[in-house]
Amino acid sequence: DKEEIALIHNTTEGMNLVAHSIELGPGDEVILADHEHPSGTVPWQHWSEIRGFKIVRPKLPILPESKEEIIEVYRKAITSNTKVISMVHGTNTNGMILPVKEVSQMAHQQDILVAVDAAQTAGTFKIDLHDLECDFYAASGHKFMFSPKGMGVFYARKDSQKHLKPLIVSRAHFRDESIRRLENYNTRNYPELLGMGTAVDYYNLIGAEKREAR
């Protein structure tokens, strides 16, 4: 759904967008496991210092025997104060693919938002964002989609968009309440946008199944 996708610059911007937006304060907790990428961790650390919420850092197994082992780590880390789980889809440390869908289902049963850093997975295999059930999903285009650098995508589930606030505002801010408000940079580098479109066309030409098989 195009009303759930905004064009951003990279994954880091998307994770900053979420950390900047969600109203948290003293007593609230955000879960960030120990395999998170620094670019997805630092935004939360920054806002934790300003707003006073707590960051919980559970340790994931290096060689898990099943996805249930990973899910259990998140389950044990959740408390009545947990408001957000921020997690990578695929780790840059050992290549683990984390069970985003199962963690999201568990989180939503307790009104916890889930933000996903997809820098290492977007473009590597077929992904159904609705099926993952996460609230937010940020990815860069230049890694496995082969777009120009400086292009990324940000997914926000429709019923979770109410939590988001633009990182940058300009003259269209007050007349646009759609997800477009998150990409309202005024002047943009249009060749990058065109390059992203061409990269998506090329990706679709090859097909997700062939890329995943490799």
Model-derived regions, located:
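Pyridoxal 5′-phosphate
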Residues: 1-214
